[in-house]
Design a protein with these regions (language model features):
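Short, strongly hydrophobic alpha-helical membrane anchors
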Residues: 1-23
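Membrane-interfacial helix-loop-helix junctions in multi-pass membrane proteins
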Residues: 14-21, 265-295
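Secretory targeting signals
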Residues: 22-46, 79-119, 143-224, 247-250, ...
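Junction motif at the cytosolic side of a transmembrane helix
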Residues: 42-50, 217-221, 294-317
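Aromatic- and glycine-rich beta-strand/loop motifs that create alpha-glucan
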Residues: 47-67
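Helix-loop-helix units of permease transmembrane domains in multi-pass membrane transporters
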Residues: 54-59, 120-149, 311
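Hydrophobic alpha-helical transmembrane segments of multi-pass membrane transport/permease proteins
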Residues: 65-86, 102-110, 227-239
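Short cytosolic juxtamembrane segments of multi-pass membrane proteins
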Residues: 226-227, 235, 312-317
């Protein structure tokens, strides 16, 4: 009697190169999520009152409909950017990276301003903050907790939009090659474009941190509309400050003084711009990212200190 064993069937499937390149992105995203969670736990352990205020502010920001609307709008726009014909003779991906970084940054800045105004200015005007400050919670802990809550909401937005953006960049490499009738790009080519994009996400996040600190400081005195107007002014002057300073060389002493004063008081947001690196296809050096991080942290500390001074003198009664 013969026994017939069933044949073993091996199923093979093809994984596109742009998807294979994303395994490194997934590992990096997991690392960022673990790091952010560890920092939050450390904040809750070392400063429980600040952590509690930050957590409440974060939940309020995430649960509001505006957060969902901004996320959906960002995802749709990033997806739409992939299929726009830019007619750049093979450099479409550079424009996609630039537009995507600008979009994510502007959406995150708007979220930071909106959240700061809702969680600080509205609570101060509605006397809701008195219930918190009546407890053994100082004004410094209240304001710092609000700032960390805003940053936590910004981190979540950057995590969602940034992860989708890196996925779209990896696919854009394959899409452009297919449209140009070129050979299919390798995994390394897809990974190369994502590596160029990563420093841009970091710099955009640092810029959003600076603008969030300014928005929190302004929210101690002004409501949403004046806050939004002033923050947009700071954003514009921050990018134009180097140009104004360079143009003032050899001009009237008063013009030169105003230019130097503006470049000193306002944040030089051009430090967080990497369009030159994108245009040349080069990586930003780690030393530049280090000093940009130091500059952002220094200015955030300065803006928060100014906010504390403004908040200490405000009458809440």
């Amino acid at each position: 009697m013969q026994l017939f064993l069933p044949e073993t069937v091996l199923f093979s499937y093809y994984v596109p190169n742009w998807i294979q390149a994303l395994q490194w992105v997934d590992l990096g995203a997991l690392g960022v999520a673990i790091l952010a969670f560890a920092v939050f736990l450390l904040l809750m352990v070392l400063f429980p009152k600040v952590g509690a205020i930050a957590w409440v502010t974060f939940k309020e920001a995430v649960m509001q409909p505006l957060f969902i609307i901004l996320i959906l709008f960002g995802l749709f726009a990033l997806f739409f950017f992939l299929f726009i014909p830019y007619h750049t003779l093979g450099d479409d991906i550079k424009l996609v990276i630039t537009q995507g970084l600008t979009l994510i940054k502007l959406i995150a800045v708007f979220l930071a301003i909106w959240t700061a105004s809702n969680s600080i200015a509205d609570e101060l005007e509605g006397k809701t903050a008195l219930m918190i400050l009546a407890k053994p919670v100082g004004r410094r802990k209240f304001l710092i907790g609000k700032y960390f809550g805003v940053i936590m909401a910004v981190i979540l937005m950057f995590f969602i939009l940034g992860l989708f953006f890196l996925n779209s960049i990896s696919y854009k490499v394959v899409f452009d090659a297919r449209e140009s009738a070129k050979d299919a790009p390798t995994v390394l080519e897809c990974l190369h474009q994502m590596k160029i994009t990563l420093p841009g996400l970091l710099l955009s996040f640092l810029e959003t941190m600076v603008m969030a600190a300014i928005a929190v400081a302004i929210s101690t005195r002004l409501s949403l509309l004046p806050n939004l107007t002033l923050c947009l002014t700071v954003l514009a002057v921050g990018y134009l400050a180097p140009v104004i300073l360079e143009a003032s060389i050899g001009q009237n002493p008063l013009v030169a003084f105003v230019a130097r004063f503006a470049s000193t008081i306002f944040p030089v947001l051009a430090h967080f711009n990497m369009e030159t690196s994108i245009a040349t296809g080069q990586f930003l050096p780690n030393l530049y990212l280090f000093w940009a991080t130091c500059y952002a942290l220094l200015y955030c500390t300065l803006a928060t200190t100014v906010g504390l001074l403004l908040f200490e003198d405000r009458d809440l009664a």
